[in-house]
């Protein structure tokens, strides 16, 4: 009987140890599932941040230095069809929008230097190639446009001494310079020899080199830029990832009246700090824009199954309001609503930037000319589609119109009849339609797999843990009942049988059972 008790006790002890172990493992699985539900995406975010840092030799660095995309530039030129009538009769200028003239573009960063302080310095190199197969016309198409060098010079002379204006008129008469020129589209963009610039080149001392030898709206952009850009790599924190730190060794501009407006702390438009929300305000800096361009959330988008946020400038970005007074250092009158004066960045040429077709601008600007259709937000709005977790631009359209603010100068006979007007020259859009498949695959892997993995791990581990807990508790309870039953049975078996007294005869003697 004692052997059976020992065997039962041993069996019960082994049974209990096994299920207590199962219970411990089940609790661990449940806690792991809860941990995954709470911290898995944060850990993935930390890993992604680590991989995004621009380190030489990494995939991110290679794609940043040599982007695997082929951006494009589409140019639309406003051809003036009634230049003589406009000058002689005061007619409204009639414009014919030609284009698009399409150029494919190759981007890369060259002369990259690691400053060992969480920043890189580099030069942009851009190569443009005309694409006749995508264009509506050839880049040698002739167009009539305002003579920008001449009209810039006359507008700047408005407040000069009268004899200087008369002398300028004589020089222009000798050189046969007229307010409108006929050039090819390629010359307008990439440069042509201008008589005024040629004269200035001959007059100006050699030690005072002119900013450019030819005139072109994109002059000097086809090739390696001389500008040195310093950008944060993310090594010291992702809050400034992809943000410009210095431009030509300067941390801010010198043109505007406040530090906020002189700031250049923005992205170049290709990468942004990760973990973007709908409440984030992005900022893009471009030298030709001469300021930071703020971008705010517009709507959610989906590109090849990848979710993103579309950001666009606020409607009052070029408004004549209190917030933008810092961009008007000379004081009122400032640029009209919808225009931004970049003359301080363009050697005092009266260049005004706007969105195409004067989108978000004063309607009177478009009404001053004929031939420009009403603006369409879908065609003329600037936007960038960003993958919010990684801060990578997936699609973009930088749409800008270049205008010339002409001032009437009656003392210069060539432009005496040229009224005060904001004359549109051309507009262009630059950007990418979508990323290559290898980049999109990486984005899907980084953004779509982790949430699925988190749910699978958290729900799966938690469910398995809960089931094992229920099973272990059930078995332990049953084991406890079984042990109680065995103890009870053992107690009953060990109890001695009741004794019986021997039979006696009538005289009191015990009866012998034997015969």
PLM segments and residue spans:
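Intrinsically disordered, low-complexity C-terminal regions of metazoan proteins
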Residues: 514-515
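Internal glycine-rich, Lys/Arg-flanked active-site/core loops of soluble domains
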Residues: 311
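Extracellular or lumenal secretory-pathway regions
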Residues: 2-307, 315-510
């Amino acid at each position: 009987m004692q052997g059976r008790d020992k065997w039962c006790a041993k069996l019960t002890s082994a049974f209990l140890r096994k299920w207590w172990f199962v219970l411990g493992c089940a609790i661990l699985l449940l806690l792991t599932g809860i941990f995954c539900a709470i911290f898995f995406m944060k850990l993935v975010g930390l890993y992604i941040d680590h991989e995004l840092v621009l380190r030489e030799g990494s995939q991110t660095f290679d794609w940043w230095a040599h982007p695997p995309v082929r951006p494009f530039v589409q140019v639309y030129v406003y051809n003036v069809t009634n230049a003589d009538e406009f000058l002689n009769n005061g007619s409204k200028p009639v414009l014919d929008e030609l284009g698009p003239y399409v150029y494919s573009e190759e981007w890369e960063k060259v002369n990259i230097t690691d400053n060992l302080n969480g920043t890189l310095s580099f030069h942009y190199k851009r190569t443009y190639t005309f694409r006749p197969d995508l264009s509506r016309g050839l880049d040698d198409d002739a167009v009539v446009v305002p003579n920008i060098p001449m009209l810039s010079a006359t507008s700047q002379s408005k407040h000069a001494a009268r004899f200087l204006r008369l002398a300028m008129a004589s020089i222009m008469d000798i050189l046969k310079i007229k307010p409108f020129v006929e050039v090819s589209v390629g010359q307008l963009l990439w440069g042509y020899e201008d008589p005024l610039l040629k004269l200035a080149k001959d007059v100006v001392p050699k030690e005072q080199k002119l900013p450019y030898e030819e005139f072109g709206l994109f002059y000097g952009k086809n090739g390696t830029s001389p500008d040195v850009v310093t950008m944060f790599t993310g090594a010291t924190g992702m809050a400034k990832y992809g943000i410009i730190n210095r431009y030509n060794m300067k941390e801010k501009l010198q043109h505007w009246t406040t530090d906020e407006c002189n700031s250049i702390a923005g992205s170049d438009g290709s990468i942004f700090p990760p973990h973007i929300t709908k409440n984030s305000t992005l900022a893009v800096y471009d030298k030709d824009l001469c300021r930071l361009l703020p971008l705010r959330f517009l709507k959610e988008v989906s590109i090849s199954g990848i979710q993103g946020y579309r950001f666009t400038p606020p409607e009052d970005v070029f408004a004549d309001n209190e917030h933008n007074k810092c961009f008007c250092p000379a004081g009122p009158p400032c640029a009209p609503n919808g225009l931004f004066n970049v003359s301080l960045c363009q050697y005092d040429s009266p260049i005004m930037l706007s969105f195409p077709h004067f989108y978000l601008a004063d309607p009177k600007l478009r009404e001053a000319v004929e031939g420009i259709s009403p603006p369409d937000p879908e065609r003329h709005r600037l936007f960038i589609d960003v993958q919010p977790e990684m801060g990578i631009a997936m699609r973009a359209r930088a749409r800008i119109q270049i205008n010339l603010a002409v001032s009437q100068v009656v003392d210069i006979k060539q432009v005496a009849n040229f009224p005060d007007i904001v004359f549109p020259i051309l507009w262009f859009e630059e950007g990418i339609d979508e990323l290559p498949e290898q980049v999109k695959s990486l984005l899907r892997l980084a953004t779509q797999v982790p949430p699925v993995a988190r749910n699978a791990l958290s729900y799966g581990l938690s469910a398995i843990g809960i089931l094992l807990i229920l099973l272990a508790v059930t078995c332990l309870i049953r084991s406890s009942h079984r042990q109680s039953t065995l103890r009870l049975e053992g107690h009953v078996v060990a109890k001695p049988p009741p004794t019986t007294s021997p039979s006696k005869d009538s005289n009191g003697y015990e009866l012998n059972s034997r015969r």
